[in-house]
Regions:
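Short, structured "edge-of-domain" segments at secondary-structure transitions
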Residues: 1-419
Length: 419
């Protein structure tokens, strides 16, 4: 029995050795012969297909060829406070943070002041107009989110502008529609444009909204629901006419003559409610007065107008600003980085030929209306509208499922091409 067991073990070992030798020969053949290697790969893949085969769960149809992704869906919807300053600094602050400040003033550089304070949504748009006839299209969600006491970031960090280019006006827009934007320039030109024409898809650089001559600059950009126009010149002339006198034309045009100038420049312009009674005039030497609007005759565009104050050759004055506005308005006087806030009702009423009353002994650098928080600077004064979806802010990416599917190969395709 022991002999038989030993003989059996020897036979098993010999059989195993022969099997190993055959396997070694087969492996060497596979490694040395590309055709044999490809044959083995095909056999293995067929086994995989047979073992794991199952019907496809997705279906590709010709009429369903793309997916459209609305990039605005990626923007968190949030109500924020937007601040714009005369020096071009911008920021957005969370509404919750702003509400907790109890009326504290925002941080500003010396001599800087706020020209726009708005309550907006991150899906809204901020339009910034410059003295060089360009506008910056800034989606609110791209503004830097900062604290109320932070200075903000200069707008050139968002859109590159020239060194001598300055932001003169900010408008908050939640809906681009048929409302009118009216532009006035230093050389006495004006034009009317439709808000809907300001929508752009690419906003990485300034966009022209009025064609200027070399020595001209934009004085003001206005969006008001009223119909009365009043323009004042630096040398003291004022002209009153109806807004319908100004034609509606394209963005890249120069406009028409707003007022007839003789060695003069436009100081300011306003669009006002016909029920307002007084024209407020402020000069660079700190003199001011209010004139009854009834002292002026409403006329037509492109005339010289009437004198707003008596000319004194020994003490010449230049008009800084002229307002026809609500008597309850507050204005800020800027001189040597100092500011002084006064009510229009504090300014005395005089006739057109008087020189005015002293409201400050300092020479004024600027005068501006005090900004109050508004939801949409260009909505009707009696109604605030808000749009949640904005077609102009959408960026769509298209992906063809059919093209992607055609790039994939089945195992059978692979085996047929495998050579």
């Amino acid at each position: 029995q022991l002999y038989r067991l030993t003989n059996t073990d020897i036979t098993d070992v010999e059989n195993e050795m022969r099997a190993l030798e055959d396997a070694i020969k087969e492996y060497e053949l596979i490694l040395s012969n590309d055709d044999e290697l490809k044959k083995v790969v095909k056999d293995e893949l067929r086994k995989v297909k047979k073992e794991f085969a199952h019907p496809r769960k997705t279906e590709i149809k010709d009429e369903i060829t793309e997916i459209k992704i609305d990039m605005t869906d990626m923007i968190p919807k949030e109500d924020v406070i937007v601040v714009v300053t005369s020096e071009g600094y911008v920021k957005r602050v969370s509404k919750k943070s702003y509400s907790a400040l109890n009326g504290e003033e925002t941080a500003l550089k010396d001599g800087d002041y706020v020209i726009g304070l708005f309550e907006q949504n991150t899906l809204d748009t901020l339009l910034l107009f410059t003295n060089k006839g360009n506008y910056l299209y800034v989606p609110v969600h791209t503004l830097p989110e900062l604290k109320w006491k932070d200075l903000g970031k200069h707008v050139s960090n968002l859109v590159p502008i020239k060194e001598d280019e300055k932001v003169i006006k900010a408008l908050a827009v939640s809906k681009f529609d048929d409302r009118e934007i009216i532009t006035f320039t230093s050389n006495g030109m004006t034009k009317k444009s439709l808000l809907k024409d300001f929508v752009v898809q690419r906003y990485s650089k300034p966009i022209m909204f009025i064609r200027l001559k070399d020595n001209d600059e934009v004085v003001d950009v206005l969006m008001e629901p009223y119909n009365e126009v009043f323009i004042a010149t630096k040398k003291g002339y004022g002209l009153w006419y109806d807004k319908s006198e100004i034609p509606t034309i394209g963005l890249k045009t120069a406009g028409v003559k707003a007022i007839n100038l003789k060695d003069d420049n436009v100081a300011s312009a306003c669009i006002f409610d016909g029920t307002f009674e007084y024209v407020t005039v402020i000069t660079h030497k700190g003199l001011a007065k209010r004139i009854k609007l009834s002292e002026f005759e409403k006329t037509t565009r492109a005339k010289r107008g009437l004198l707003l104050l008596r000319e004194v050759k020994s003490n010449p004055q230049e008009i800084l600003k002229a307002y026809v506005s609500d008597a309850k308005k507050m204005i800020m006087l800027v001189s040597d980085n100092d500011t002084k806030e006064i009510k229009l009702t504090e300014i005395p009423i005089m006739d057109r030929y008087s020189t005015g009353s002293t409201i400050t002994k300092k020479k004024l650098d600027n005068v501006y209306e005090v900004s109050h928080l508004t939801k949409d600077d260009v909505t009707n004064k009696k109604e605030v509208t808000k749009s949640v979806t904005k077609e102009e802010a959408k960026e769509k990416k298209e992906v063809s499922l059919k093209e992607i599917d055609d790039k994939f190969m089945t195992i059978d395709d692979f085996l047929d091409n495998f050579s």
